Amino acid sequence: MRSLPSLIAFLIVYLIIPPARAQSFYGSGVQEVRVEIPFKDWDYKLDSMKKANGEARILGTAWVNGLRFDSAGIRYKGNSSYFRTRNETYKKLPFNIKLDYKIKSQKMPEGQKTVKLSNAFLDPSFVRDPLAYEIIRQYMPAPLCNFTRYYVNNKYYGLYINTESIDENFLEKHFGTSEGYVIKCDPDNWKRVRSQTGCPKGENASLAYLNDNFGCYDAFYEVDDPGAWKYLLQLIKVLNKNTDKIETVLDVDQTLWMLALNNVLVNLDSYNGSLSHNYYLWVDTTGVCHPLIWDLNMAFGGWRRNFSFEEMKDDEIIQYQPLAEIDNNKRPLIAKLLRNSYYRKIYLAHFKTIVNDYLKSGKYLSRAQDMMREIDPWVKLDSLKLYGYDDFQNSLEKTMHTGPDHVIGIRQLMDKRTQWLLKHPLLNKVQPEISDVKHAPDASDIKITAKIVNATNGWLMYRSDRMFAFTRTRMYDDGTHGDATADDGLYTAKVAAEMAKHYYIAAEGSEGAATLPERASFEYFETKPAAKKKQ
């Protein structure tokens, strides 16, 4: 038997899987939002405000699932989803409702203060946003998203997509703090002009380096505080000029997940695509930037314009390459990171995990069908929807035509893409195998070991708190560095105990890479002392 002291000192490995945070307004079922606006010409007023100043609001009363919010601020939101919809004379426009606009104490029971309602622009299925967010939340922090019945002055304006804001409440929930800065890499006003003249052209929020003047970037990025510009420019300079130091300014693993998710789901209205937008950067208190995906109504091939703004053919999006844009210096997050052998192997491991979890298993399709069954009655009643009811019913299997665009059916795209990806040589590389992960105290340090085979390098990824990115340090199988026996496949690393509250293992082989847990860094191991025995 172990002695009592050793039992007390022993540390148990806990696998941490972030819990599904089902919240009433963002939970299952169709929600309800009502607003009362005291103007007959409220739509004209909102249009005028949107064109003059995208942030201006009119006052109204809002009811969210029956809860009343007085003096709420109401405005239209969106770029293409507003301007193109309005130009085509449709009345179903996207809304932003700020519940605490005048009464700062007002918020929903779960803490949210803003309601963001999208109009399913270029999505006859209505499910692209909620389905893509549901998938993404298994691998990185991302907003909750569901469906809402929306009424203005007691008139049913249709079924809307309801997406959680990336705000202080979101940051507290996922990172345990709202300190730091938030950078929106897609300003609400897409017509804004840079404050500095004589700048290089630039290309939206691509993180390409232009020069050291903040005024050359402020048409492409929107900051919540002027102090954020320093950290954005620091990221841009390191990414483009000193990539070896990128882990000091960027949560690289979360970035690799974002890039892989955009690619697998053919979400090209994103950083990966021709417009290079629709994401946020949260800058933590150490100056490290964490990317967050936003706006997924054109995932699953809904946006298919290439870098020449020509519409891509079906085969081009079905066979959208896993390493697309690796040679495109206008997308440095892709080009700079994926040209690094280690990062590329980890990216492909993440890519394969997503394919196996949601495409190969068919889970993406079953969830899409579940969602469509749930909302069917409300879509049918929606007289202002941007597509016909038949378009909704056929949107999984058939391509819908809307203006100059062809919106491919979700299943029509993803079933063929799944079969093509499963045969792709990049997803059939030999990967290392990781098992038998353990940790134990070693004086003021903690020693972490793992069995790794088919690997050339083992890495310990660790951090002291969930607000931080993981730090990488090498694990050894050489009989030194705390490793007992050389070349036995048991890799070891030691770090200061207070710095390794969370950790996971990464391994790199000659062909591929692997992590344990497989969904790391979103899932990870945690060190905790064993409970003491009662005397």
Pin down the residues of each PLM region.
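Phosphate/dinucleotide-binding and metal-coordinating scaffold of catalytic cores
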Residues: 22-444, 453-469, 509-516, 525-535
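Bacterial N-terminal signal peptides
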Residues: 8-15
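Surface-exposed, short loops/turns at beta-strand junctions within beta-sandwich domains
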Residues: 495-500
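Aromatic sugar-binding surface patches on proteins
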Residues: 481-494
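A short beta-strand segment in extracellular, disulfide-stabilized domains
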Residues: 447-449
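Solvent-exposed serine/threonine-rich low-complexity stretches and specific carbohydrate-binding patches
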Residues: 471-482
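Bacterial N-terminal signal peptides that target proteins for export
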Residues: 1-8
